[in-house]
Amino acid sequence: MKKWVYLFTEGNADMRNLLGGKGANLAEMTNLGLPVPQGFTITTEACTQYYEDGKTINDEIMGQIMDHIEKMEEITGKKFGDKENPLLVSVRSGARASMPGMMDTILNLGLNEEVVEVLSAKSGNPRWAWDCYRRFIQMYSDVVMEVGKKYFEELIDEMKKEKEIEQDVDLTAEDLKRLAEQFKAEYKEKIGEDFPVDPKEQLLGAVKAVFRSWDNPRANVYRRDNDIPYSWGTAVNVQMMAFGNMGETSGTGVAFTRNPATGEKKLMGEFLLNAQGEDVVAGVRTPQPIAKLEEIMPEVFKQFTDICDTLEDHYRDMQDMEFTIEDKHLYMLQTRNGKRTAKAALKIACDLVDEGMITEEKAVSMIDPRNLDSLLHPQFDEKALKAATPIAKALAAAPGAACGKVVFTAEDAKAWAARGEKVVLVRLETSPEDIEGMKAAQGILTVRGGMTSHAAVVARGMGACCVSGCSAIIMDEANKRFTLAGKEYHEGDVISFDGTTGNIYDGEIRTVDAVIAGEFGRIMAWADKYRSLRVRTNADTPSDARKARELGAEGIGLCRTEHMFFEGDRIDAFREMICSDTTKEREEALEKILPLQQGDFEKLYEAMEGNPVTIRFLDPPLHEFVPTEEADIKKLADAKGKSVEEIKAIIDSLHEFNPMMGHRGCRLAVTYPEIARMQTAAVIRAAIKVKGEHPEWKLVPEIMIPLIGDNKEFAFVRKIVKETADEEIKKAGADLSYEIGTMIEIPRAALTADEIVKAGAEFFCFGTNDLTQMTYGFSRDDSGKFLEAYYNAKILENDPFAKLDRNGVGQLMEVAIERGKKVKPELHCGICGEHGGDPSSVEFCHQIGLDYVSCSPFRVPIARLAAAQAAIAGKAK
């Protein structure tokens, strides 16, 4: 019989695929002899089976769960629902990859009216017993039965108002007993049946809820953002309760072995006395710093710091730990490699190498490339910052600078950002439902919560700026306003805040580009040492090219020449060319553009200092260049000596029903060879001039013909380019080599790659944006209308325009490389779609033997690191 359930004593850290991260680490801590409450893990395979069985737990799995409850009862001497010594458990999710705040927890399971009375009498602490029960009813109702938390919070607030108290901890045992009754009445009203009293029924409901939560909307969003496959499933951990809410000698906390915001080697964390675990993470009360624990319970603090050292030495990484103190007894509830900011990740990795704990390869492998993005984001301008006076200071939860218009809900943040507004999200506290709004905002500011609250952890993970626990804010969410430092702020008012200092400012403060710190350079140098894949950039302007070079780009993989036509007066000349009747007229118009285009290419060659520059010839259809405004149409008519009506007729004739597959790319060069001739002359003249000024540079222009689908098509355009280039070189008496290649963006080109190479192609560059469009038959501009439905229906797990489709598009790439290199082994191949900066796509590019990836300038460090990680992972296999 298959094993679906494991005691903590039966697992270890290597079993995370089966036991999930939390279960594997609880087993590992148990093996290390640390104080971990007894428990067992229901495997990720059981979750997958639950979905295969139509969202039911089959008898075999159910039987094993009950067997393990009996084993726990034997080990602990406690029994589920017992009148003498009742067993209470927590039920927590635990996927193999950490998903903070994405999945739901239930504490105090096993309670009912009778058990509460037993606990109350045994402990002599009725307040604690009733506090546990009201928490359990609230959590179970929310997580298992999906009765909103807010209904229960409202009842608590009413009770506190009635009793004229501010904190939950000031409620008496009698108050909490009344609350439990009110909660059960609320449950019955919403669900239509009594709250369950049988602990086994409660457990079954809780396990199903954890399995269900694997497929809730926020978990799906997090998985898509973090490349976590749906098929992994989540494990469920059932663990004997340790109670942090038994009074002032009990508590609960979260701690990191190093600072997750800065990387400093110093224990950082928070705890709350007389509280349960969720109180700290949910950020409902603002907790105390971990150092205070040494004053309150020195022995517990010493034991805890020793455990921290043990865990960091064991895992050789910064640990994020949850603990509970029950009447001065310490229990470890979780450890995992801690989420951290990009800045902290770099410092921790470098420090661990310097401390002799890990190798350079390990340091490179432990950094999430996507998080580097936040290091390249703006910071506040120092001068502007000095001139500004903070109106308040709170906890610096996630670094960076945020400035924008205030919004109060995640929905508004998303909607305003979609309109192009820069917004900051101001909340009492955030919850997992806010995740998309948090992504859309420039930064997050919360009234409650500490450094380990949901807002702080999620913001750090996504590289967003966050300031938390600003209790000086008087919030009025219903009317979308708050008061701070005597001023009332409404939706749309502008504020700024600094996630590195915790300072909050009225109005806008200017931002500047981030300065790359020393550790960044070290990690990048190590990455460059281990990677084999080159990294180029997509750049059309000298400033983009220079920025990319600063960030480590080794050339330009895609220069889109059409962007150059829109600058200054040259659009007028290009429009004249489009509206010309004869080849001669077109050539005259293009002659005006040639020196301007040549100047553009010279600047790019200079910025790249002899590194490769791939120039793609004109790609978009001509209708994208024609005027739409009446004044511009009149100007063009005057220039061409035609009537406005004639120009409008030409514009109308350029309209296409399906422009993506219409008169564009190499088809323009076939119908208007003079465009290709002009662009070739500009490329070659620029190269000759720059090479003359810098003979030490190895300057070999790469001319890329777009949208080729047939070898004869390529041969036709190549002939035009070659004749023009050779003529220019001869005329200048220069010595210049150049290459002519093509973009592979039509499936037919991939399938006939050998024929295209035989026709003279010297390099391939995969334009995966169009290749994905044409392989899937999706329009990139319109797919947003249906992709969400595809995610919900489990047809797709990721946006194929963001993450390369390995099975379809990837196979076409492999076919093209294999067939192309069979004819010309030295054929060099790259990728220049958006996928060039996506880490998982970069990994695939390494695996199939591409020579380079090309991405936008700010994604160059991400691609460099991802390429190194792919090489290191490949070597390990």
What positions do the PLM features span?
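Protease-associated
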Residues: 357-440, 503-509, 520, 524-527, ...
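Structural motif
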Residues: 237, 407, 424-426, 445, ...
